Amino acid sequence: MTPHFNRLSKEGVFFTNCYANSFRTDRGTVCTFSGYLGLPTASVMKIPAKSRTLPAIAEGLSKAGYKTDFLYGGDINFTNMKSYLLSTGYQRLTANTDFSLAEQTSNAWGVNDDITFEYLYNQLRNRKEEGPWHTAFLTLSSHEPFEVPYHRLEDKIPNAFAYTDECLGKFVDRLKQTPAWKDLLVICLPDHGFYYPREGSNAMPRFYHIPLLWLGGAVKQPMQVDKIMNQTDLAATLLGQLGLEHTAFTFSRN
C-alpha cells in the first residue's frame, strides 16, 4: 500500500512504536503541536480559552527566530483550526481559498494532495527568506469518502492511502534535488490512526498505532527507534533535539 513510505523509512529515523492520542484531526493536531492529551468527549481546539494557554511547537520556534507557516488544502476554519494555529505561533496560513475554484473542489474536503504537495514543493524551492523556518502541512485525501485521482488498488480505502504515499514519495525525491535538502528536517506523522481492515474492536492497539519518520539532510544517519512513544512526545523530542526549551509541555517526553 505504501511503497514510498516503506522505502523512505530506511533513510531516516523511524519510530516503530508510536501511538496516536485520539481519533479525530482536531484532537490529533493539538496532541502533535501542543503535546496536550486528546479528550474523548471534548475538542480543545474548539475551546479558545483553553487552547490559547497551551504551549506549541510553532510558538517555541518563532521565539527562536523561525518563520512559521501552515498549509492545508481544506477549510482552515473547520473545528476552529485557524484560531488555534494563529494563537499558537503560525505566522502565515495557506488554505483552500488560496487555490483556484477547480482545485478547491478537486476533493470532497478541498484541494487534492498532489496539488498541495506541488504547491509546497514550489514554496520550499523558491523560498528567499534569511534564517530558519518551519512549515507544517496537513494532507486531506486519505479521508472518507476516499475518492482520489489515482487507481492502483481495487479497494478505495487503501487506494486513497496509496495515493497520498505516491504524492509523498515524489515530493521527497524532488526535494532531495534542491539546495534546501542538506539542512532540512522532514517529519511525517499522521494526525490519528484508522480502523482498517475493520476486524475486531476499534479499541485494539492497532487502531492507534501510527508511523513517525524523520527525514532529510539534517539526519546524520538512518536508525530505528523501537521505544514506545505517544503522539504528544513529538514536541519535547523535536525541541530537545534543537536545543530549545520544552519544559512547558507537561505531557510530552523527550
Regions found by a protein language model. Give the residues of each.
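Solvent-exposed soluble domains appended to multi-pass membrane proteins
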Residues: 1-254
